[in-house]
């Protein structure tokens, strides 16, 4: 007699079979292996939202393109990477981001699966708050993107570390600065150093000792990642 957990796994495999992995006959056994051996038991439920999201995104995909993608090693690797990443996702937003990257890689003919795997790995380097901050820097002006900023105002509320500031404020400022520095290290944003107008020398923060920045802007790679996870629309092609 099968256990409830085995039933969940079988249901998950069957559900996924209705989406992209059902296109290629040998993809079903591949998913079964991923679920049975690579995904811890307690994470099976996390894949449900991902499978539904992937199925939704691929429902209008052209089967011949998907079949061609999955017939390539990189395409199968992308599908596998997606399921493994989704098994670690703890929010629906994260599952949606992953599904968007994978679906684009498998269903868009001119899309490189290797590129999508790179972006998926890049996404795995960020926590959910860092993703929101990356989206924040897409439109960094004070009066820009009110709806998005209001929705996440607790995250974006600026913290200031100054001499005599409460410990909680210093900690929050440290986290925010760490997020920005991490995005910079990954090449997703770049900060413009603030210079003294009279001397032309960079200005330094008295508290941290680091150069002050006038503003932080998103890079092309940052825009690409946001576009592929579905947080911004694709830019219209030049006419």
Regions found by a protein language model. Name each.
Residues 2-53:
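Membrane-inserting effector segments that mediate pore formation, membrane fusion
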